[in-house]
């Protein structure tokens, strides 16, 4: 049984993570944190999440309760996640990272930390999305050189980064399968007279509207036919359950940088 700490416990994902841990037979909720200025500091996390009294009080810094947990699950903001990574290094804890929008220096910090502690990082913890990543690799190897490739993603109005980490992950899977780096072929915006589309680019389009949980489509368009691979999420519990699954898998692993491909053993497919 892995003892889990939830960073950003009062957020949309934080509350779902609490529910996912509560419903898991492999994990137990051991700690929860919120930003220092939150009015929920000192509140019982179970009561906050509508699950009844848990005996776990929300703290403003997980450093205060490091003896209580084995793994942090962090779906917050890059600046907060990087602080928790430092905490994990200091106290030999594992971390599951669902935060997106890291800068290149931030990614380098995570990579260096993974040499000391076990880290799972994924743009999306849905089992279905990670299967899609694998399907995209296969599709790109068969069709990529002959098609125009576009990725369209849609999320709720409150999402603060674009394109989504999942969309970027899709682009990386496709580009990598074709022997390219995404940064060399990605086109994130088109406006005005753009000229003819180049053959090797991967285009991205972003929608932010309403309460869309998450929808992603990768399009392989040739003359006369088009293949689309789509994933639609209707409940954030999909992501939360996957992250809890990852925390159980990560517990007692050797230091290293892992992804959901490792958690789900997708490389064997």
From Swiss-Prot:
Keyword set includes Transport: no
Binding residue positions for NADP(+): 35
Sample GO molecular function, one term: NADP binding
Keywords (A to Z) from UniProt: Amino-acid biosynthesis, Cytoplasm, Diaminopimelate biosynthesis, Lysine biosynthesis, NAD, NADP, Oxidoreductase
Pathways involved: Amino-acid biosynthesis; L-lysine biosynthesis via DAP pathway; (S)-tetrahydrodipicolinate from L-aspartate: step 4/4
Enzyme Commission number, as recorded: 1.17.1.8
Binding site for NAD(+): 8-13, 34, 98-100, 122-125
Catalytic activity reported: (S)-2,3,4,5-tetrahydrodipicolinate + NAD(+) + H2O = (2S,4S)-4-hydroxy-2,3,4,5-tetrahydrodipicolinate + NADH + H(+); (S)-2,3,4,5-tetrahydrodipicolinate + NADP(+) + H2O = (2S,4S)-4-hydroxy-2,3,4,5-tetrahydrodipicolinate + NADPH + H(+)
Keyword Amino-acid biosynthesis in record: yes
The protein, known as: 4-hydroxy-tetrahydrodipicolinate reductase
């Amino acid at each position: 049984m892995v003892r889990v700490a939830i960073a950003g416990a009062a957020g949309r994902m934080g509350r779902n993570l609490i529910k996912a841990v509560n419903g898991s037979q492999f994990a137990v909720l051991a700690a929860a944190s919120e930003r220092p200025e939150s009015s929920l500091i000192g509140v019982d996390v179970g009561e906050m999440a509508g699950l009844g009294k848990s005996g776990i009080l929300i703290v403003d810094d997980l450093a205060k309760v490091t003896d209580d947990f084995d793994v942090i699950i962090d779906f917050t903001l890059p600046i907060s996640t990087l602080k928790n990574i430092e905490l994990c290094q200091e106290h030999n804890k594992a971390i599951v990272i669902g935060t997106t929008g890291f800068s290149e220096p931030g990614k380098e910090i995570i990579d260096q930390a993974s040499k000391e502690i076990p880290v799972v990082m994924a743009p999306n913890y849905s089992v279905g999305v990670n299967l899609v990543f694998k399907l995209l690799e296969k599709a790109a190897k068969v069709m990529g050189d002959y098609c125009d490739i576009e990725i369209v993603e849609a999320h709720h109005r409150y999402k603060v980064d674009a394109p989504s980490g999942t969309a970027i992950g899709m682009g990386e899977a496709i580009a990598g399968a074709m022997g390219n780096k995404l940064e060399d072929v990605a086109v994130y915006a088109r406006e005005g007279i753009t000229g003819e589309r180049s053959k090797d680019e991967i285009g991205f389009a972003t929608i932010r509207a309403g309460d869309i949980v998450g929808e992603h489509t990768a399009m392989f368009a040739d003359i006369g036919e088009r293949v689309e691979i789509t994933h639609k999420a209707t409940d954030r519990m999909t992501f939360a359950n996957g992250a809890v699954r990852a925390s159980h898998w990560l517990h007692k692993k050797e230091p290293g940088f892992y992804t959901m491909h490792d958690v789900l053993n997708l490389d064997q497919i």
